[in-house]
């Protein structure tokens, strides 16, 4: 029954990707849709109000400049709001302003689509901050990621201009993110998720004691949290909290929605380059890696804790520590896998309580950072590996490698190599810094191998813009707030800049006709080769660190 539950969720996800991906293609290419009569007027009003010239096209440098400037302004405004949130506007619970280190971490976290939270949502942010800062950035960061991916695909398809960042940002928000979020938020409200501006309720329990029940505009935040692969929760318990994820049905919907746009982006890619088989090959590689991770995580958690088994305690129900009974092993394991496949970072169970092998799965997913990934940017990472795969295969047969009818030359490979190196460099160097400084070691709550995994997970999550964590880490300190913030920032924007440079280099090349000697990239052989290359590079890069963490912990149980 548990396997059937997982299968149904993933089948629904795949089926929904087809129409949503086609719709995203129409939005990106300004094709007609049913919503145009209404949304054209809304978009036009926004263009006039903000002075956007919608006909103006940008090259890759202009696109990046617009992106960076457009990200900088709300970051400054958001920082100010979090610092002064103690004022009485939409703050019925009298939440105090955040201190500077935590504010820096929070702004960078939500700006970069990471949503790493070193604060408790119900006590650390006012309603004003939750709506104006947190929810706004969830839309803004997701729209930015999708816009970059669309510009990336346009360049790969041979267009010299990448579009207009401001126009892309508006259209993605009004035509994709807002409609989906409204539908999902209404569903959540129907399932019992709160949506109110009332203050917290104090109730008398059956034991006769008083308990404070936190409330707030939860449903609206929860919808975009998953749709935009954001992951930050209204409550500190995130999607394990009954007010965020009350039923097995909402849990299934959350899994589907956090995968939906990331998977639909691949379908959109196939339409935009007019090569649907190419999209199928990429999608298949992602699904194989997803299924492998889900199978390993589920098996490890279902087997339970071997240390408890050896002392005679039954493990027939599996490892239920840190999990919600309403979701069970299947719902928790699948959520754990896909939330780190997609760089979402929402959690419906305590990752710190996973078995060593079960906990290694989300860690490795984020280290690879290619399995669907966050909305937009994760897809670009997979294309980066596809380019590298074609290049290596070309070397083996002695031919000039080609991808999408464009020759892959030294410039592209140097940029791709740099982009691949950035991710592990940020993870391993920052982890080494934390493990060799007094401030870093002070945050580790568990000694030995598990403590090392906590540190490794924190920086892997930050570099991958995921945001989930082994919450045993004491991370609300100046050291952890600043170091994680810097890693999140570099992990987001360095990748975007490098990969747009790669795409623009492809756009400048002439298309070459395919010949009998051309390595086909739209078949099973390519999919298998792509998976092997990803696994080999990931193992060569991260295996020593993983061996010192979860693998060593498993061997010592």
Curated annotation (Swiss-Prot):
Parts of the chain that traverse the membrane: 1-21, 62-82, 132-152, 176-196, 253-273, 279-299, 371-391, 415-435, 482-502, 528-548
GO molecular function: P-type potassium transmembrane transporter activity; potassium ion binding
One matching Pfam family: KdpA
UniProt induction comment: By low potassium concentration.
Keywords from the named record: Cell membrane, Ion transport, Membrane, Potassium, Potassium transport, Transmembrane, Transmembrane helix, Transport
Mode of membrane association: Multi-pass membrane protein
Coiled coil (residue ranges): none
Localization per Swiss-Prot or TrEMBL: Cell membrane
Keyword Lipid metabolism: no
UniProt keyword Ion transport present: yes
GO CC annotation terms, alphabetical: plasma membrane
Assembly description: The system is composed of three essential subunits: KdpA, KdpB and KdpC.
Entry-linked NCBIfam families: kdpA
Family indicated by similarity: Belongs to the KdpA family.
Protein function: Part of the high-affinity ATP-driven potassium transport (or Kdp) system, which catalyzes the hydrolysis of ATP coupled with the electrogenic transport of potassium into the cytoplasm. This subunit binds the extracellular potassium ions and delivers the ions to the membrane domain of KdpB through an intramembrane tunnel.
PANTHER family hit by this protein: POTASSIUM-TRANSPORTING ATPASE A CHAIN, POTASSIUM-TRANSPORTING ATPASE POTASSIUM-BINDING SUBUNIT
Annotated protein name in UniProt: Potassium-transporting ATPase potassium-binding subunit
């Amino acid at each position: 029954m548990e396997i059937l539950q997982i299968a149904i969720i993933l089948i629904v996800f795949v089926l929904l990707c087809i129409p949503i991906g086609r719709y995203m293609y129409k939005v990106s290419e300004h094709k007609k849709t049913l919503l145009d009569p209404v949304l054209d007027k809304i978009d036009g009003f926004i263009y006039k109000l903000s002075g956007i010239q919608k006909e103006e096209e940008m090259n890759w440098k202009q696109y990046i400049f617009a992106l960076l400037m457009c990200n900088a302004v709300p970051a400054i405004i958001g920082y100010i709001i979090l610092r002064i949130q103690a004022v009485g506007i939409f703050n019925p619970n009298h939440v105090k302003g955040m201190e500077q280190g935590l504010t820096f971490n929070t702004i960078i976290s939500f700006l970069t689509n990471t949503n790493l939270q070193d604060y408790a949502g119900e006590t650390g942010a006012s309603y004003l901050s939750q709506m104006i800062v947190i929810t706004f950035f969830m839309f803004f960061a997701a729209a930015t990621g999708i816009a970059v991916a669309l510009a990336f695909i346009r360049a790969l398809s041979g267009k010299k201009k990448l579009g207009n960042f401001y126009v892309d940002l508006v259209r993605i928000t009004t035509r994709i993110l807002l409609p989906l979020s409204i539908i999902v938020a209404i569903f959540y409200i129907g399932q019992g998720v709160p949506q109110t501006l009332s203050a917290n309720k104090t109730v008398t329990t059956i034991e006769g004691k008083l308990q404070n029940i936190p409330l707030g505009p939860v449903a609206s935040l929860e919808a975009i949290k998953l749709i935009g692969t954001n992951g930050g929760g209204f409550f500190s318990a995130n999607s394990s909290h009954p007010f965020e994820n009350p039923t097995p049905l909402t849990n299934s919907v959350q899994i589907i929605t956090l995968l939906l746009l990331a998977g639909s982006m691949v379908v959109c890619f196939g339409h935009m380059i007019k090569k649907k088989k190419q999209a199928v090959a990429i999608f298949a590689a992602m699904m194989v890696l997803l299924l492998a991770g889900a199978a390993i995580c589920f098996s490890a958690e279902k087997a339970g804790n071997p240390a408890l088994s050896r002392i005679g305690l039954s493990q027939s129900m599996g490892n239920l520590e840190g999990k919600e009974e309403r979701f069970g092993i299947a719902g928790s394991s699948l959520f754990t896998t896909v939330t780190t496949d997609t760089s979402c970072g929402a959690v419906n169970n305590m990752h710190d309580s996973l078995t060593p092998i079960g906990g290694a799965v989300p860690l490795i997913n984020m280290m690879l950072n290619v399995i669907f990934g966050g909305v937009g940017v994760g897809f670009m990472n997979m294309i980066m590996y596809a380019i590298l795969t074609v290049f290596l295969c070309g070397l083996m047969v002695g031919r000039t490698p080609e991808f999408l009818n464009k020759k892959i030359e030294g410039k592209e490979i140097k940029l791709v190599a740099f982009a691949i190196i950035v991710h592990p460099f940020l993870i391993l160097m920052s982890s080494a810094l934390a493990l060799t400084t007094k401030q870093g070691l002070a945050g580790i709550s568990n000694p030995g191998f598990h403590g090392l995994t906590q540190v490794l997970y924190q920086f892997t999550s930050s570099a991958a813009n995921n945001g989930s964590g082994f919450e045993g880490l004491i991370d609300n300190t100046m050291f952890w707030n600043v170091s994680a913030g810097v890693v999140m920032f570099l992990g987001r924007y360095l990748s975007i800049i490098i990969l747009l440079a790669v795409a623009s280099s492809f756009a400048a090349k002439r298309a070459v006709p395919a010949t009998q000697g051309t390595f086909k990239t739209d078949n099973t052989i390519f999919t298998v080769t792509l998976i092997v290359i990803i696994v080999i590079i990931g193992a060569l890069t991260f295996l020593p660190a993983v061996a010192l963490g979860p693998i060593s912990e498993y061997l010592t149980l």
